[in-house]
């Protein structure tokens, strides 16, 4: 059907053009897709007992995808969420192949038909208010970074922001006027506004 070099060409175009230029995915999502497909290729090469460079487009089958997903959970100990993320990446790649190689349409149809697994939501663990107050009471007060550390913890407690959202925060995102608030840049290139408590704004 093709040659090993053809698979390499499709992979290069998938990551360099399709995901970036056509789908406009974020770098973190592209890295996740890359990791998923890398693991799938390694699994396929081991299954065929061949080198990665010897893999062919015809080796990309729905049967292997199903076995790969089973391998992720049973042998690699991946969570259901991780398994579903890997499946999303493979669905996207198989759809891409089918759009360029009609002979892959049936395989792509079977892969996109693989259902995601449902998992019970993880139990959310949190601190009660008195526990949070105890944390603040025990923060060092005389270190060079005491004010910074206290402000960061209070900001996180106030907003529920992720660590990366705080790291990406810019002065222009803060409004410390009569109604203090902050604009946070979250996952999926989405923005949200969060009010700030007066102690936090001060």
Residue ranges and their predicted role:
Residues 1-202:
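Conserved catalytic core of the tyrosine transesterase superfamily
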